[in-house]
Amino acid sequence: MKSTVEQLSPTRVRINVEVPFAELEPDFQRAYKELAKQVRLPGFRPGKAPAKLLEARIGREAMLDQIVNDALPSRYGQAVAESDVQPLGRPNIEVTKKEYGQDLQFTAEVDIRPKISPPDLSALTVSVDPIEIGEDDVDAELQSLRTRFGTLTAVDRPVAVGDVVSIDLSATVDGEDIPNAAAEGLSHEVGSGRLIAGLDDAVVGLSADESRVFTAKLAAGEHAGQEAQVTVTVRSVKERELPEPDDEFAQLASEFDSIDELRASLSDQVRQAKRAQQAEQIRNATIDALLEQVDVPLPESYVQAQFDSVLHSALSGLNHDEARFNELLVEQGSSRAAFDAEARTASEKDVKRQLLLDALADELQVQVGQDDLTERLVTTSRQYGIEPQQLFGYLQERNQLPTMFADVRRELAIRAAVEAATVTDSDGNTIDTSEFFGKRVSAGEAEEAEPADEGAARAASDEATT
């Protein structure tokens, strides 16, 4: 078999393939044997009919069509393996010559990974916001803790923000009662913004057994999106009494003996949370800095697949009702055109990010170890509240393990970029990134690390992008 590659663009090639007819003869023999078992010819036992008679019965052209169709995937795969191209997605195959006894010729056009040269990581500079912790941050955490230990007490006064009320709701559209929108005895914290838009404003100032009518759009049911007249009736009003922030409260709410110790602990928690936020900012800023220095050509089919995935996710909550989706966008002050433009821009950036990080991982010869995969499984399973083994089975059943493998490999490439870069805050202070991104692994340590699967990184990454 012979094959040549034509570069149509930085992201697309045409592979020209020529297969000698002699290489197809074994395929013909196998096909004849299978047909002989299925086709009954008078005077011959099943499986014993001569090839010539089978060919006459089925037709040579039909046989040839079947053989060629069966042979194309493997011959295309062989041509790809013999080249240095890395396909993305499915090829567009066209048979250009197909005659019995002569060489088979076909072309395959396919998007490929563009050749990308990552920049010098040691020259990379990243700047992010500094971590600032004020008394207001600690006060907010303390207030949240006091709220958790607060008690609700019935009061005989009008509703105020922060109260917890018991309410009844009913709604009408054009004078018609909407049974699905009615509820009794709902508990609602005023000011939380939950339940229905406009509800908080409606109940403030009402006393027990008083009602008010306000206008709101229904969010669900057959009248979803329509304006409704909503009646809210307050049945009871309770205020939340908070414990005093003193030593006694510290002993009640924590393992500390004094409020000062509790505040110090809350300050540490705030700092840790802000360090995690800063780490995410470093991660994103590093990717942006890399993208600014590298031209990443975009494979159109890959971008379209990413865009389709975004749209699919957006429509899934509406049973893929695009008309309703378009209506909701208008209600939110947007439009389908604006959504599509924003989604395509995001898809293009995501594709650039993936391709660049894959190229960086190739250049750095990143290997995904068993520990790396285990760490990702444990972290992800905690987010979903399931056991790691259960998550592994779920991913394996849906053939999503290659996607996770590719994501982990890209994350390791990001860590390497962050470690090599100069990272400072906007005040000029150097930031120690080792807590969240780890320390650079030496060449000797990298060689000793056990890879998750020899050669699996590229295969997994390719499968994840098809």
From Swiss-Prot:
Ranges of residues in domain PPIase FKBP-type: 162-215
Biased composition (Low complexity): 457-466
Keyword Cell division: yes
Localisation: Cytoplasm
The protein's Enzyme Commission number: 5.2.1.8
GO annotations of cellular component type: cytosol; peptidoglycan-based cell wall; plasma membrane
Catalytic activity from the UniProt record: [protein]-peptidylproline (omega=180) = [protein]-peptidylproline (omega=0)
Function: Involved in protein export. Acts as a chaperone by maintaining the newly synthesized protein in an open conformation. Functions as a peptidyl-prolyl cis-trans isomerase. Protects the cells against high-temperatures and aids in the restoration of enzyme activity of thermally denaturated proteins. Contributes to tolerance and adaptation to host-generated stresses. Has strong immunomodulatory potential and modifies the cytokine profile of the host towards the proinflammatory axis.
Note: Expression in M.smegmatis enhances its survival within macrophages, adaptation to oxidative stress and biofilm formation.
Record-stated family: Belongs to the FKBP-type PPIase family. Tig subfamily.
Name of the protein in its database record: Trigger factor
Organism phylogeny: Bacteria, Bacillati, Actinomycetota, Actinomycetes, Mycobacteriales
